[in-house]
Amino acid sequence: MTAGATSRTTLHRTVPHEARATAASLRNVSFAYKNAPETVHDVSLSVASGECVVLCGPSGSGKTTLVRVINGLAGSYCKGTTEGVVTLGECDATDLEQWERAERVGSVFQDPSSQFFSSQLAGEIAFTCENLGYDHERVVAATDQAISAFSLDSLRKIPNDSLSSGQKQKVAIASALGPRPQLLAMDEPSSNLDEEAAAHLGRTLARLKAEGLSMVIAEHRLAYLMDVADRFLLVRDGRIEQELSRTDVFAAPDDLRRSWGLRSPRRTARPKLPHPNESATKLSGATEPPALEIRGLRAAYRSNRIFEDVSLTVEAGQIVALIGKNGAGKTTLARILGGLKKAQAGSIRVHGRTCSYRDLRRRVWFGPNDVKAEFFTPSVKEEAMLLVKPDETHKNRARGILHDLDLWELREQHPATLSGGQKQRLSIACGLMSDRTVLVFDEPTSGLDALNMEVVAGALETAAREGRAIIVVTHDSEFIGRCCTHIFELE
């Protein structure tokens, strides 16, 4: 155990769990979505005032559903049947009006843009407070306080739909905290945050916890929570299988921890990998042109520069990690490569051919971070086959890819019924099934547990061996170390 780990494990709760008031409890709770099998089975748990409980476990185990049970979305917005008793404080949740429940429980969804109602930052935070009937002075004070807590002042004038995925996540968290709820229920709040932003989130949550805020967090990424979490509840197949302490998580062997679906509890150093342009220089005598060449690319939003003079060469068989801080322009660059956004200047060549942004749509696969808008068919199997001929060759290839990504057993399910991590893997499967030789994925491991991160890494390695060039926008140091061959940092 490292010195850093030792200092973490010496942090103890100053008040015994049993002695504190209960912020929320579930007693023998089960939930089944409409026209679907039961997702949560006979779960009982309690969260004390000022306590942080982390729900962890494999993708699709029921963590998101438990968060929805607590914040009231399960059974109302998400149609289905709830059994058992849910209490918030000393009140039965069924006795509370929806606005009363929203005042007590702040929510952060896995897809932050799905909870936005306003076009800009301040309006988004104010919206929640205004709907709870706060007077103007209180709304302004709460909005300014939330913006300050997350250092978001520079985003005040930027439309929410123009923010990076990480910036959107920060806005969603700030919005949930605006009215100062008693309990914060969050689903993968760090999935799109860079290491620095995740660490800042951890420090902010620690301060709020010290002020008495209770938290339930569904999360795979644990390092930023190790100074905050009191307990880790391992969720598997819709049940709480085991309760773990910080010491348990730190002490678990890597294989056991991965079998639980948990990422490393220690901050993972970014691997030292070569810049892709260095490899291109060494291969300058090659007869075949590179798979992808970017020269002098520039992008801006209105009068604000996003990046300029970006040049990059990617060879077939390489997996390049595109890294950088939230807001550096990684998603913008990925969308330009996929032909979804025009660059202001510069050129892009694919296998030696200069491409317009329309050409890029046909020659480069782009897998977005927001995968919910990507699916069009009623089943996983049909989605994987959507862009290819329905012949035996492609059917066999789809079967193999779905097996590799642990989706074959879900092949008849509608994509909308999948968990966040399962949707992410289906998006990757669609890219691998395409005929594109250049693949670009935006945060392909967000929402993935440790085992499924390994599954995705293996699938991308196979594609690279087949001669494809792959670029992944990512903050995931574990993933980079597992499969990437090069790193390109956008500053």
Question: What residues fall within each predicted segment?
Answer:
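Conserved beta-strand-loop-alpha-helix hinge in the C-terminal portion
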Residues: 239-261, 491
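Conserved ABC ATPase "signature" region
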Residues: 137-155, 393-410
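Conserved ABC ATPase signature
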Residues: 159-163, 414-418
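Helix-to-loop junction immediately C-terminal to a conserved catalytic motif
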Residues: 71, 338
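ABC ATPase NBD Q-loop/coupling interface
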Residues: 85-100, 347-360
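Catalytic Walker B motif of ABC-type/P-loop ATPase nucleotide-binding domains
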Residues: 184-187, 439-442
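ABC ATPase C-loop
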Residues: 176-177, 431-432
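H-loop/switch region of ABC-family ATPase nucleotide-binding domains
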Residues: 219-220, 474-475
